[in-house]
Amino acid sequence: MIKTRYALLAAVAAAGLAWSAAQAQEKVVVRASGGGTFGEALRRICDEPFTKETGIAIQPANTDDSTAQIRAQQLTGNVIWDISNTSADTIFSAAKAGWLEKLDWSKIDPDNKLPPIARHPYGVGINSYSETLVIRTDKVPAGKTMGSWADFWDLKTFPGPRSLHDTPVKNLEFALIADGVAPGDVYKELATPKGVERALTKLDQIRPSITVWWTSGQQPLQLLASGEVYYATAWNGRVAPLQREKVPVKIVWNGGALIVGYHSILKGAKHRDDSYKWLKWCWNDAQRGAELTKALPYPGFAPGLMELLPKDLQTELPTYPDNLKVQFEFNGEFWADNLPRIQKVWDRWRLKGN
């Protein structure tokens, strides 16, 4: 109990560093998001113009683990952040715990322009990416086309080393699709022990060819670039840089998992009204959405965004119509509820082999 208390206090103290710089300002919103390219783009494209027009300052708080800090702030009653990034699965667990504000969509999207996928009760969709099959086109046998998960599982037609993410999440969905389950039915199937076993049995078929279980987002691209593996799952935004370096890799969008990221307002946020203003400003504007997508190819959902982008960039995006229609939407709520149960089964399965 004492260790838990210290951990909570440490998390709140870390979050408080962002607040201390903004504390003296009368109108300020503390926004927690990842840093790097995305954080810099948010500052330049959304934060600074918003402050110039409204007089409301945005104080960024960079974090790699928003869930732990949201939890700490809520359990201690010391809510420092106003807005935080939430992932496709953690948004459900945080909302169920009562840590997030249920959004008033009339303040963010009064004209109902945003698509349903961007309008979560507890978060506005800010970006999207896909986990897909990525292939070395020079390793595909002559006269053949690898275009589905069934092909990925076809070791006779498409021999060679493969790589998958070291997690049950999305691997089980891909396995069931390869086994003939319609994408719209995979979560119904995985909700049963029989469905999980079916997915693992399917994975057994290709297990000898999974030479690397990747654990970081850049790893499968490095494996593909070096030729250590021929086919792998990977996140779409990391593929284009390899293509620009003339590495012969290609995304297979068919059967990909589309994943949405969100911005949420914390329960008890000190600057709730100004937070709503910023969410509307940044995420319900096509021009700003297009500029953010040019900086990082994980598009948001503001109507008209796609048309403002160059055609060659459009076709690289998961929400480009031709790409979107062949994917399924990742169900974060399912994994928020079922990961502990399925992870135990997965861990036992992984211990049996490579």
Label every model-predicted segment:
Residues 18-24:
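Sec/Tat signal peptide C-region and signal peptidase I cleavage site
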Residues 322-354:
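Conserved C-terminal helix/tail region of periplasmic/extracytoplasmic solute-binding proteins
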Residues 33-43, 79-81, 85-223:
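Extracytoplasmic ligand-binding site segments that recognize negatively charged/polar headgroups
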Residues 25-94:
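Early extracytoplasmic/lumenal segment of secretory-pathway proteins
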Residues 1-9:
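Bacterial N-terminal signal peptides that target proteins for export
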Residues 261, 266-330:
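Mature extracytoplasmic/periplasmic domains
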Residues 113, 129, 197-206, 243-269:
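Periplasmic-binding protein-like
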Residues 91-93, 225, 231-248:
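A ligand-binding cleft/hinge motif common to bilobed small-molecule-binding domains
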